[in-house]
Amino acid sequence: MMVPQQGAVVKLDALAFAYPGGQAMRFDLLVPASEIVALMGPSGSGKSTLLNLIAGFERPDSGQVLIGSGDVTRLPPFKRPVSMIFQENNLFSHLTVEQNVGLGRSPTLRLSDGDRAAVSEAIARTGLAGKEQRLPRQLSGGERQRVALARVLVRRQPVLLLDEPFASLGPALRDEMLDLVAELHRDQQMTVIMATHDPRDAERLSNRLLFIENGTIAADGATSSFLAGQGPPAFARYLGERKRLR
């Protein structure tokens, strides 16, 4: 049985970054251990960049990324105590469900008996029992994201980053996946930072919302307050534009 764990504090201290020829971005952020935070904002505002800076896929020009008690600013992604799920490309197409989940324990898939037990438990926990030997192409979109969540379970990292992983799913399946994330959070108490364009995602999963605009955190507050119209005018305009596009 998986032992309960605790999330880690995530702190971005004067973190500066710019793509070549792009706008300068700056992030200052403190996320307490085990909190769930939603990131919302226009496309290109910096949501994915913020997540990639935490995960280590982008290197800041200056500033620090702190996770728990450690400075991880210069660490490569595989050495950071972070798991991340994207909208696509979470799985290796030539590996089975069991193998894709097993990568969370060992990149060489040399698994101990304890590792195999953890993989089996995670597969069952995410509703994939009986599909261990299937390839990703034999799964539905929702099932593929369940495999990604199962891999998160066996990695047992204190921080989970979600970059619109359920955006391509229909409303019912999307809600089901968000509920599964919430259930895993209750058990493992990991810190969760989720980028989304859908206010329903934020409302369902998080109590705190950050509005990202022009490469910075433009507003930070309770999700309920933002969605009740108490956020900045720019957030209301953003939601209005999203509704027009749907």
From Swiss-Prot:
GO terms for molecular function: ABC-type thiamine transporter activity; ATP binding; ATP hydrolysis activity. Keywords: ATP-binding, Cell inner membrane, Cell membrane, Membrane, Nucleotide-binding, Translocase, Transport. It comes from the Bacteria. Its main location: membrane. It catalyses: thiamine(out) + ATP + H2O = thiamine(in) + ADP + phosphate + H(+). SMART domains: AAA (SM00382). Residues 10-239 form the ABC transporter domain. GO terms for cellular component: plasma membrane. Its EC number is 7.6.2.15. SUPFAM superfamilies: P-loop containing nucleoside triphosphate hydrolases. It is found in: Cell inner membrane. It is a peripheral membrane protein. It is an enzyme of class 7 (translocase). Disulfide bonds: none annotated. ATP binds at residues 41-48. Pfam families: ABC_tran. Belongs to the ABC transporter superfamily. Thiamine importer (TC 3.A.1.19.1) family. Part of the ABC transporter complex ThiBPQ involved in thiamine import. Responsible for energy coupling to the transport system. The complex is composed of two ATP-binding proteins (ThiQ), two transmembrane proteins (ThiP) and a solute-binding protein (ThiB). This is Thiamine import ATP-binding protein ThiQ. It comes from Chelativorans sp. (strain BNC1).
